Amino acid sequence: MSEMTPREIVSELDQHIIGQADAKRAVAIALRNRWRRMQLQEPLRHEVTPKNILMIGPTGVGKTEIARRLAKLANAPFIKVEATKFTEVGYVGKEVDSIIRDLTDSAMKLVRQQEIAKNRARAEDVAEERILDALLPPAKNQWGEVENHDSHSSTRQAFRKKLREGQLDDKEIEIDVSAGVSMGVEIMAPPGMEEMTNQLQSLFQNLGSDKTKKRKMKIKDALKALIDDEAAKLINPEELKQKAIDAVEQNGIVFIDEIDKICKKGEYSGADVSREGVQRDLLPLVEGSTVSTKHGMVKTDHILFIASGAFQVARPSDLIPELQGRLPIRVELTALSAADFERILTEPHASLTEQYKALMATEGVNIAFTTDAVKKIAEAAFRVNEKTENIGARRLHTVMERLMDKISFSASDMNGQTVNIDAAYVADALGEVVENEDLSRFIL
């Protein structure tokens, strides 16, 4: 779990997302409260439940990006789902319980990686010895007992040195690796049958888990495979499951996007299997229930839920009252201005202009954007959003792709050249398309 303070979390989010201070503060406080709760003693700790968040704002202002960045900062089980993918229990489609199953799978992967990292040093030593055994099989006497001579030991040390320096990386050897490592069985689940598919997959994996298979591979690949193999042997599967379930129950975060799309519209009274029914199915998860997963029973009482939606057609009050009550913190994200677009193009880490500069640099082309050019690009994107559909910052991708079209196509023939993109260049590339509303609608 992350131990970052709210100020540090907001500072980290500021490197990637422009504006939306209220939303950043809300998620930063929610994330820090997870850590604060874990410092409490029982039974008070059990009584402190997370305050779920509802983020409201037009498309393309940073709701989903906040979730993506939060996932990396949280260092906790995290899953992002689309509310529109689920249907009411009893109908064809995914049930909402699969959210918790997927979250538990995510936790298993996270905890497994953490455990492998803890045991990596020991696993590396054993893997190195197995590689050396394959390169220099120990000499045996007539009774089949291993003999250990000094000369053999000195040769082994010489090979160990070469192995560590990478001199043997491309040499091929034959090694025994666990069949489970090399033969992953993946089964695609039809809608509504995820549980049965999980059981089948576990069965196939268990069948090959104790078997080994001879494989011929390069030493650098063999070393990685053997390290994973040895690290996996040092992990207790039952302990791993329990740690993963604890991580989900105490620190899990679920981000539900497009929640406005499952609001009931108007007085429509027909079958609504993917709207109000889904909201009612979500209720037990959000307020706390027990979900059966292939790893064990998971309680959802202390999982943090963050929901988001544009609410352009529906309103938050169109959610069923019970669900509204389970999302007590409301955060409104504001629409982006031309000045915000200008900042988005230059300020964030790995901004769009930096990405295009780096891409063209691979062809030996140096790209420079003037301040006037950046301002004009931002204004063009903002104007197209006003004239047509407002898709927020996503419009910048379309405008930039149009602007860079000629350079991207000819870059391979421009090695060593420098291209200065100024206001005149932007006007020439985008002018007609931006001014003509019909062209904007179809091209940008």
UniProtKB/Swiss-Prot annotation:
It is found in: Cytoplasm. It comes from the Bacteria. The keyword ATP-binding applies. One of its GO terms (cellular component) is HslUV protease complex. Residues 143-163 are annotated as: Disordered. InterPro entries: AAA+_ATPase, ATP-dep_Clp_protease_ClpX, ATPase_AAA_core, Clp_ATPase_C, HslU, P-loop_NTPase. Disulfide bonds: none annotated. ATP binds at residues 18, 60-65, 257, 306-309, 322, 394. One of its GO terms (molecular function) is ATP hydrolysis activity. Keywords: ATP-binding, Chaperone, Cytoplasm, Nucleotide-binding. Coiled coil: none annotated. GO terms for biological process: protein unfolding; proteolysis involved in protein catabolic process. Pfam families: AAA, AAA_2. ATPase subunit of a proteasome-like degradation complex; this subunit has chaperone activity. The binding of ATP and its subsequent hydrolysis by HslU are essential for unfolding of protein substrates subsequently hydrolyzed by HslV. HslU recognizes the N-terminal part of its protein substrates and unfolds these before they are guided to HslV for hydrolysis. PANTHER family: ATP-DEPENDENT CLP PROTEASE ATP-BINDING SUBUNIT CLPX-LIKE, MITOCHONDRIAL-RELATED (PTHR48102), ATP-DEPENDENT PROTEASE ATPASE SUBUNIT HSLU (PTHR48102:SF3). HAMAP family: HslU. Belongs to the ClpX chaperone family. HslU subfamily. A double ring-shaped homohexamer of HslV is capped on each side by a ring-shaped HslU homohexamer. The assembly of the HslU/HslV complex is dependent on binding of ATP. This is ATP-dependent protease ATPase subunit HslU. It comes from Haemophilus influenzae (strain ATCC 51907 / DSM 11121 / KW20 / Rd).
